[in-house]
A protein has these predicted regions:
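His/Asp/Glu-enriched, well-ordered alpha-helical/loop segment
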Residues: 1-119, 123, 128, 132-136
Length: 143
């Protein structure tokens, strides 16, 4: 999703006013039954997943621009965005039986963060910090 907010200043000039309406059109895709799988787009974009969640939910840069978001009807909800980065990304990689959710029999890869992204202002999500990282049920990082 960060590529949308990175591209918003030049995308319409490059692909035109007609085609831009179908670009980055996440809610339109969802309405047609498309699974939206999200990732960081690293190395072109930051690997920080909270930058991507912020972009998907607000469709704004870190400066809160543009007002209301770029093509705001295409914003994802926080729940939709988190699913795109977890279960739907695992589905896209044909790994949904072992990744994407915390369930018995799955790998138990997860992070603990310093805030509840569902309880804060969407414009603050990109500031989220990881406190712990767990891989296969083992803590591998602690702040």
């Amino acid at each position: 999703p960060t590529h949308a907010t990175s591209d918003m200043n030049m995308a319409e000039d490059r692909i035109g006013p007609e085609r831009i309406r179908g670009a980055y059109a996440w809610q339109r895709f969802r309405a047609q039954g498309t699974v939206i799988a999200a990732g960081s787009d690293f190395p072109v974009e930051s690997p920080n997943p909270f930058f991507g969640l912020h972009a998907a939910i607000t469709r704004q840069g870190h400066d809160d621009q543009p007002d209301g978001g770029w093509y705001p009807t295409q914003r994802l909800t926080a729940e939709q965005a988190l699913r795109a980065f977890t279960l739907d990304a695992a589905f896209a990689a044909h790994q949904e039986k072992s990744l994407g959710t915390l369930e018995p029999g799955k790998w138990a890869d997860f992070i603990l963060v310093d805030r509840d992204i569902f309880a804060i202002a969407p414009q603050e999500i990109w500031r989220t910090q990881v406190l712990e990282t767990w891989v296969g049920g083992v803590r591998v990082f602690a702040r």
